[in-house]
Structures are given as structure tokens and as C-alpha cells.
Amino acid sequence: MDIKRTVLWVIFFMSAVMLFDNWQRDHGRPSMFFPSATPTKTVGSAAPGTTTPGTQPADLPATNAAAPGNAPAATQSQLVKFNTDVYSGEIDTRGGTLSKLSLVNKGDGKQPDLVITLFDRTANHTYLARTGLLGGDFPNHNDIYTPLPNQQHDLTGDEKSFQLSFESPVKGGVKVIKTYTFTRGSYVIGVDTKIQNVGTAPVTPSVYMELVRDDQPVETPRFSHTFIGPAVYTDQHHFQKMTFGDIDKNKQDYATSADNGWIAMVQHYFASAWIPQQGVKRDIYVEKIDPALYRVGVKEPVPTIAPGQTVDVSARLFAGPEEERMLEGIAPGLELVKDYGWVTIIAKPLFWLLEKIHSYVGNWGWSIVLLTLLIKAVFFPLSAASYKSMARMKAITPRMQALRERFKGDPQKMNSALMELYKTEKVNPFGGCLPVVIQIPVFISLYWVLLSSVEMRGAPWILWIHDLSQQDPFFILPVLMAVSMFLQTKLNPTPPDPVQAKMMMFMPIAFSVMFFFFPAGLVLYYVVNNVLSIAQQYYITRMMGQTKAKAA
């Protein structure tokens, strides 16, 4: 029995260590076990003019990420403010760049009125979306655009949408009119680039669309951090994400050209993504442009524009929460920015089920409780077999100890006697291991579901729990977790080895300290799971005792 219990605890402990190691690697930190493999430099064949990972495209204009207030007076731009039912933001006339974007009604549980600022450009933080032209001395994100007159800046009344347009200076015989379309209830912004040839010679420019941000971490509770960095999606190579550390080491790996897909910047709970027109060939680039500034973008060639002609290039810009159902309806594969890693195949059905439960009960905390009940019901046959095996082992523990005492000088005879005892009593010393092994993928999957789901952010449960994505403010759930683990230890047979017995008593304390910093929603799951496990084990053990008494 002591061997089996050791195996169970080692499996549980290693699963927790693997979770922490996965968290480390998602943050660009080295793995505790495996060195980072050097990835292939490119994925697939790069078309002429594409970039290789880590190489700056030669024709991209130099960046200008300084905050407007730090710019020289002669080149000072202005900020055009706008408001919708989901956004408040600013467009910088330098480049017609979307330099600030806040998501209203996305505050946390402590400060419900606090909006989340996704895009921003200050002295301490840079994150923005911008576009421009390549292929000549054409308008780009460094030029000062002029807002068109008599424009609406706010979504009012019953209006479904409004537009803001900006006109560039004429450069290289080309003028650009950039138009942003904001729609009620939508986190997708239409971006139309109208390219007018006002010169005397044909021009063949390319349009670039990029997301620029620094490597500042997102503020989230300890043990609750997830991936931050650029990502690329194409139909051929699917979802490819890169840490800022990968880019620093020139180890980023992504498709460099495609005629489909999107590029994104991903962070905990929120993401932004450029979604160009599908079926149009484009090059993709990911690079470091300043000591702590990175960009991911696409370059889309434009057909030759004759003098007097105009060409429109349309794209969509997503900036919002990582809500799976919404993302699925915006673009193929966009829901993958909510990244579950290697447990996606289990995590996605779990989230679907959690979402279905929530649609009926209307509370994410109670949804977690009910999901835990369902999971325990599904695994009940396996759990019952495990608890029955443990009960049989507990019943023969005195005889096992007697055999160990009798043959303590002869390990071979002791093992032989123990095997004979197991055979006589029809006990499998490892009978309780299988249910634990099978449930580990579910354990890890639900961890990532609860950690990654923006729906938990600001979601209350009862009484003192006002935000399931934050740690328990009074540590009540972690204490209950410690108590439940201690009770489970008491229900199981005591290991004959005193050192091992002390280790079994210490493990609940060690795990509970770690859970002090986990999100309340995650700890809630484990508390409910432990309570149900105790109830199951007590019931099955009692039933076995009654059956044995009747048989006697």
C-alpha cells in the first residue's frame, strides 16, 4: 500500500510541477527539464520578397513609437478621440494610427468601473495598430494625416455605426485616405485604405498592417500568467506563437507568406489581430525594432495604379476579449488566441460544457461546482474501483505490517509473502493508480480552461468571492482545500514507514500554500472535487464494511 500511495502522490506532484514548468516556458523562461529546441528558420517556402524570421524587411519605414507629447513641436500631431458602446479611444494624426483603445465595461471585480486599456502609447508603455504604404516615398505611419471635416466621433442614439477618415499628404504622387468604421456591439473595426494616384506616372505600392508593442508584462495574480507575444495563423501551418525571448534570440518560427489567415498580439484574456482580405497574397514579418519594442505585420502588394485611378484595400482589426464563440464567428482559427496548448482537445469540450451550464444557472462559480459534479459522476466507476482497492489494502494493512516485521531481514521472502497475501485476498496494490492517471489530463485541461477564460474575470460567486480570476482575498478556499486534503489522507491507510507517513502529512500543507495564489475559480474546483472524493470514498468504504458484516 505504501508503494501505491507513493506512486499516487508522485503522479499528483509531477502534474503540478509540469503545470508550473509549462507556465515558465509560456513566459519565455527556460524549461526546468528540457532546453529550448532551436526551431526551423522558416515554415514552408517563402515567396520572393518575403522575410526570414528575425530579419527586418528592408523597405519598411523606421518606427516612431514615441508618445505624442515627446515629439518636437514642429512635428506635433493631434489625437482624435472617439467613443462607441464597447470602445473609447484615440487616433493619432501621425500616420492615422490607432494609438489608444480602451474596452469599456471590462473592469475587474475590485474596480468594476475600471476600463481595460489595450492599445496605448505613453512614456512607459507602447501598444498600437498602424498601417502605411511601401515601395516608394509614399505616405506611411510617420506622416501627419488630416482628419476630414464634419465627422462624427461618437456612437449615439440608435445608430449602428460611424466612420472616421484621415487624409495623408501627397507623397510620391500618391494620396491616402484611411477610414475606420466602428460598429455597435462589435470588437471588429473596419479599416479601409484608399490609395489615389494623383501623379503623372503609374505606381505599384504595397500596404503594410502591423501591431507594435513592448514586452511589458500584463498585471495578473501570481501563478496566473499566460502567454504574451505575437502569433500568426495560416490555413497551412495553423496557429504559431512566439515569445519575445524567441524573437530576441532570432528563434521565432512562422509562415512568411500566405493568402489567408491573420496576425495577432496575444496577452492574458485579450488580443488584437489584423485580418486582411482572404485570397490576397501577403508577406508576414515578426521582428524586434527597438531594445524593448516588437512588431508583427503583413505586407500586401497592390496592383499597378495608373494616374488618376484609385485602389481600395480593406482589412479588419479585432481588438477585444478572448471569448471563444465570438472569435469563431470573426475569422477561421481566431479562437486559438485563447491557447490551451497540448490539452486543447480536452479543454475545448470542457469549456463548451462549462458555458452550457452557465447558460442555465447564470453564475460562473456555481457552473464550476456543477461541472465538477458531472466530472465526478463520469469518473465514478473508476473512482469506486480505486476506493475499493484502497479499502481492501487498509483491511490487510495489519497483516502486511506483521509480514514486514517477520521478514525484515530478508527482503526477497518479505516480497514473496506480500505477493501471496495480495493474491489470497484478491488485492491489486496498484489498483488505485489507474483512475488518478486517467484524470490527470482532465486536471490539467480544467486548469487551463479556468485560467484562460476571460469570462471568469470580474465574475462573482458568493459572499466574499467577487472575482473568480483573482485569488481568494481571505484565503478561505485554500484553507478548505488544506482541510479536505488532510481528511483524504486520514481516510487512506497509513504508510508503515514513519518518514513516508510524515511526508503524506506534509503534502497537503505544501500544496495548499501553493494554492493560496491560484485564482479562486480554480481553487473552488479542487475544493469541490476533494469534498466529493471524500464523500465517495466514505460511502464506498462503508458499503464494503456492511457487505462484509452481512457475509459474516
Swiss-Prot record:
Keyword Glycoprotein: no
Gene3D superfamilies given in the database record: 2.70.98.90
TM helices/strands, residue ranges: 3-23, 364-384, 430-450, 504-524
InterPro entries: Membr_insert_YidC (IPR019998), Membr_insert_YidC_N (IPR028053), YidC/ALB3/OXA1/COX18 (IPR001708), YidC/Oxa/ALB_C (IPR028055), YidC_ALB_C (IPR047196), YidC_periplasmic_sf (IPR038221)
Assigned keywords, A-Z: Cell inner membrane, Cell membrane, Chaperone, Membrane, Protein transport, Transmembrane, Transmembrane helix, Transport
Record-annotated disulphide pairs: none
Biased composition (Low complexity): 42-59
The keyword Repeat is annotated on this UniProt entry: no
A Pfam entry, by short name: 60KD_IMP
Subcellular location: Cell inner membrane
Region Disordered, residue ranges: 35-59
Main location: membrane
An MF annotation (GO) of this entry: membrane insertase activity
GO terms under cellular component: plasma membrane
Protein family according to the UniProt entry: Belongs to the OXA1/ALB3/YidC family. Type 1 subfamily.
Function text: Required for the insertion and/or proper folding and/or complex formation of integral membrane proteins into the membrane. Involved in integration of membrane proteins that insert both dependently and independently of the Sec translocase complex, as well as at least some lipoproteins. Aids folding of multispanning membrane proteins.
Oligomeric form and interacting partners: Interacts with the Sec translocase complex via SecD. Specifically interacts with transmembrane segments of nascent integral membrane proteins during membrane integration.
Entry protein name: Membrane protein insertase YidC
Classification of source organism: Bacteria, Pseudomonadati, Pseudomonadota, Betaproteobacteria, Burkholderiales
